[in-house]
Amino acid sequence: MAMHVFPLNIYRAMHKRDGAYALLEQMNGSLDKNAENIILQKGQQAPDGTYIVIVGESANRDHMKAFTPHYAENTTPWFSEMVGTEDVALGYKAYSNFPTTIMSLSYALTSANQYGDTSLKNAISLMDALRAAGYETDWISFQSRSSLASAAVTMIAERSDRTYWEQDPDEKMLDVIQKLPPAKKRVIFVHMNGSHYSYTSRVPEHRWNDFGISTQDPDHDYDVTLAYNDWIFKNVFEYAREHMHLQAMIYFSDHGENMVHYHGTSPFFFDMVHIPFFVYLSPEYRALYPELMVQLKKHAQIVFTNDLIFDTVAGLFQAKTNFYNPEYDFSSPQYSLTKEQALTFHGKEKISDDLGFHING
């Protein structure tokens, strides 16, 4: 495997021993080494086509009408429409594993999680598992490549076959996708700016009034970002389905958002880890693997934490390896996480302590 090159300040950050930067030290060299030990399970063959994984930013499902039907503002008209089809399942009890991006995605995009092996020294990246299964991988990011806050995510992202680091509004993801080189079977990852504060900077000014969010809404600016995201998802989905042989599309957020304290470790509130989780499987894909959507819909009201994205995507996309565990795969009949077992804040908080657990669905 070719050596991956990162900005110098990321490597300097590895010398820091505290907080998120300890993750960099754990991953440095380990991802390459562990990738050499990947063994793909036999009998898996996903069909050719395009598979999309969209990683949102600071999206709180409590503000998304598809997940919280009694919410006053229709922030998710496309999601809400799709929920009524046979092709889509939602995770109404989805949580982030940590209320910051770098800590959350370092687990979501690797085989490490809060329940089994928590050490990134022993982990592989999702990109490496997918490549072992015959996929080409693309990473499109609208966040910084070289900031220290995104260092671990950059290290994982750069394991993709191609990376694209954009400075435009999120809606430009469709332009980037349209210009990708042809690929027989590919997974496209998109990392959005999403709903990160400051909210007014996430939506182009000329689109601010396009989504019907009431000016009387106390969380107007935040809710506009969610409606803007929903519109983007619709555009990407329709293009990929029409022109790219779309087989599957997954969306989840890195973490949620509190309307007073935003997100972070102190103070901590559970809405900081309330996230959306959306899965689309094409009719063609469902015909090949009918049990997947059955299980996803069966688990819709069961707790899920996004450090299990690795196992779930591997299961959905037929990329199961010796690092895969069906008990952590939301699409598997063996999925076994319960509310009492579920954790966040990397094991320091119990989901069962969340007084808002029953707010969605």
Give residue ranges: language-model regions:
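Substrate-binding/active-site groove segments that recognize
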Residues: 271-279
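Acidic helix/loop microenvironments that form the catalytic cleft of cell-wall polysaccharide enzymes
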Residues: 194, 253-261
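A long, amphipathic alpha-helix that forms part
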Residues: 32-42, 175, 211-249, 279-281, ...
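Membrane-interface soluble catalytic domains
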Residues: 128, 145-148, 238-243, 259, ...
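DG-centered beta-turn motif at the end of beta-strands
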Residues: 54-59, 250-256
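Alpha-helical scaffolding within the catalytic cores
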Residues: 175-176, 262-266
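Active-site-proximal alpha/beta segments of enzymes that process anionic O-linked groups
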Residues: 1-210, 305-306, 311-336
